[in-house]
């Protein structure tokens, strides 16, 4: 077993060796290095063919038509293109948008920008388990609601929303439905032929592909229109200009192909490991799982260890790579806004650790993690006067702390 142990697969994944090998054939003079937009020679044709194959591999995983796949620089750009693109195109029909408070910043900040442009956004609060109440969603829909954006799997707590039911509510209201599926693609069965999803954001590096490339699914029937946010040579049917990075696209395609092939065997394996981790940690006093355990990614476990500061715990866990909050926002000292939206107090939100398992996680690593966690929590609580007070039966909420 090699230390440190990587348990932060929701932040990024290593590139699968098979993917890296495939990508290498599209970089040098001996490889297929052409510009897919070069229509006058073999170098361009070969590159275009490679892009087409990757487009089909991505479409195959999600039950889409390859013509519905638009390549972007990543899921953040896909979210921006979907939300701004649809809002701007359909603004004559209305200016109301619905989203949820636990969405990724790429969705929330894009909605904030649209508010500055005169759009109105309803931010739904999830239930305590992280799920959206469908009745509340239905009640938020209005005749002028042009767009709803709800993520499939949450990046912090791994909770899976019922995108089938939400999509049907949107379709009945003639509202465009965007899903951020960055965390769920390749981990959960998605068949867009059966879902009323109009736009779907995807990433490559969350599924063992390279960083710097992603895709947006744009439905053809019923056709969804977008206003471009990057202008230029009219690539990607005018929706996203810019020379296509063939090696990255090929890598993403190969990663999606592997995921389709191995998903049925890999997800039960990860669920068994995740449950092993949970069973090993749940007996620690004052630990709380964040988010529904029933409707959740098999690879995610988010636990709050009360009376332990999350940052101190992470420092004590030098041999394990985990995160306390989303990788995109963990640079700030604010407690996780996702956990706050579930109703957790600052202390519990600050004491949360996200474990996300992946393709290279082993049983040995999980057992090592359990032992290390138990020791670290015990050690830090031994240093905590709050823990002593709690053990003495003092209700800490009744204490008035003096301000400094």
UniProtKB/Swiss-Prot annotation:
Molecular function terms from GO: 2 iron, 2 sulfur cluster binding; cysteine desulfurase activity; metal ion binding; pyridoxal phosphate binding
Annotated organism of origin: Haemophilus influenzae (strain ATCC 51907 / DSM 11121 / KW20 / Rd)
Entry cofactors: pyridoxal 5'-phosphate
Pfam families found in the cross-reference section: Aminotran_5
Catalytic activity, reaction form: (sulfur carrier)-H + L-cysteine = (sulfur carrier)-SH + L-alanine
PANTHER family linked: CYSTEINE DESULFURASE (PTHR11601:SF34), CYSTEINE DESULFURYLASE FAMILY MEMBER (PTHR11601)
Protein name stated in the entry: Cysteine desulfurase IscS
Record function comment: Master enzyme that delivers sulfur to a number of partners involved in Fe-S cluster assembly, tRNA modification or cofactor biosynthesis. Catalyzes the removal of elemental sulfur atoms from cysteine to produce alanine. Functions as a sulfur delivery protein for Fe-S cluster synthesis onto IscU, an Fe-S scaffold assembly protein, as well as other S acceptor proteins.
Enzyme class, first EC level, given as a word: transferase
Ligand binding (pyridoxal 5'-phosphate): 75-76, 155, 183, 203-205, 243
Pathway where it operates: Cofactor biosynthesis; iron-sulfur cluster biosynthesis
Record-linked PROSITE patterns: AA_TRANSFER_CLASS_5
Enzyme Commission code(s) on record: 2.8.1.7
Gene name of the encoded protein: iscS
Top-level taxonomic group: Bacteria
Subcellular location: Cytoplasm
Keyword Transferase: yes
Family that this chain belongs to: Belongs to the class-V pyridoxal-phosphate-dependent aminotransferase family. NifS/IscS subfamily.
Lineage start: Bacteria, Pseudomonadati, Pseudomonadota, Gammaproteobacteria, Pasteurellales
